[in-house]
Swiss-Prot record:
Protein known as: Peroxisomal membrane protein PEX29
GO CC, any one term: peroxisome
Disulfide cross-links: none
Family: Belongs to the PEX28-32 family. PEX29 subfamily.
A Pfam family it matches: Pex24p
Known role: Involved in the regulation of peroxisome number, size and distribution.
Amino acid sequence: MDSVTNFFWNDTYNAGTPTRSTLKGKKVQNGIDGKSQAKKESISSGSRTSDPTRGSLPSSSGQPTSGGGFPSTSNIQKMMADTLVEKIIKMALPPSSKTAVDTIHHRMVAGKERPKLSVQITSRNFIQMNSRLGVPFMIMDELIKILNWTNPAYTVSIMFLYTLIILKPFQMLSSLPIFYLLFCVMVPQYLYIHKPNPTSYLDNNQTPAQGPPLRRPEVPKPVPELSQEFVLNLTDLQNHMLLYVKFYDFTLLILQKFAFFTNEAISSFYFIVLLIIATLNFLYMDKFIKLIPMRPVLILLGWGFFIASHPSNREYLLTKLNSEETRLKTLTISTNLESKILQHLKLIEAREHRLVMIFEIQKYLPEYKEWRPVGFSDDDYSLFSSLRIYQRRIEENSVKSLEEIEPPKDWEWEANSHWVLDLDPKEWVEDEFIQYVEIDSETKWVYDLNLDGQRGSYRRRMWTNSCVRKKLDSGISSNLGEEEVVNPLREETYRQGVHGVTKGSMSGGLTHSSDDDRADEESINGTIPNLNNIDADASYPSIEELTDTLNSTI
């Protein structure tokens, strides 16, 4: 029994187990999370994370206990049933969309202290709510009666009342609730307990009987389940649900045309227009409102709405709005507007490119008097690097070859890209503020310098590669006529050249960006060399062999 209850109660089992992190390539700038993942056989490709939507379940100590301090059998069964239903929902019912995952997580965190999903609680709460829905449905019936002109005199009276509210808003809005309480609640109740005498001259005698009360006062209570009011509330709830459904669908139909960036050009245009309107409204509406006679305008709009809601006028307007002619005119106007927007906003920002940095680490062995390769790491392993400060072995945080390095999460290597050896180590040493190192300008190695000024036992050099942002959805396609361009506001942050050669080739040098280069070959710290023009299979010896030979000679 203990193992069964642990299955239901221990919702965060093994959640605190430490995960194994992967090595990541360091990017040129720390502001962008673009570190490349470096993997080897003993390192997992991704760390395991606990499910963020899984909340902790209440412990048994928080449940009602029977005499003796232990939970009763009925409480245990109820707890297990509720937890089982919750777990089944989590496993079997996925989120409706990817954007809803965060919303679901926040809602689950907010509802952590609330009761779990239960059929009994749902049924009880629904019955309690339905027994108290009489007043809202009566108000809705009155509104429908007014707009349908069931009693024209009543509707005209409401129109005059609306006019009076517009003319004297503060007096009317502060007095109407009090008048309603006096003449719609208290007076009918007084007439009920002081029942008027019937008369043959009037249908309803409004003169209360004199003397003490003739009836007991009736205080409104929730209607019982077996009553006509309860059934009427249930029927009205069933029918009025469609009002919210239609309102929701109509609102979504309007917003999906521009608010969700289904077409970036159209949504960008509406965003700019709405931003300008909101800004002008915030800054100048108090001055602009003085130039408009608001009260006559509101009165005309209100009376026009009431007149348009008359059954005969409403039928004519709805027929006109839903006609094929109106639909074609609206479609023509919207199509012309969208075509003009697409014509002027056909330029889109180029796909993001980033430069990934990896350091090749070598260690000097005095007994052999030679440098032995250690591996490739995202850490430069200098004297003040994080690995050296925490006394971690570089062998455990590196891989043996560049081919084992993976791009950062949600990124992918650029097509036909190669690893490039950086031939200007002074630049990245200064950019990363690396201290106590010595730069060999001939071999391009950066050596450790001990505090006494002697060379240390480690050296490193930097390799770079370019990656592009991965498309998370395969169905994304660019619209016809769109042109990718580099954002001019970000162009200043790009470096104009990378000094390096590709792995396995001596063809290299200082490569610069030109007008003929593709716009998407811009990186965060410069233009990636045009690796398509570099012969990776050339017959020259590799740069690694050359630098090692020079170093041995020195």
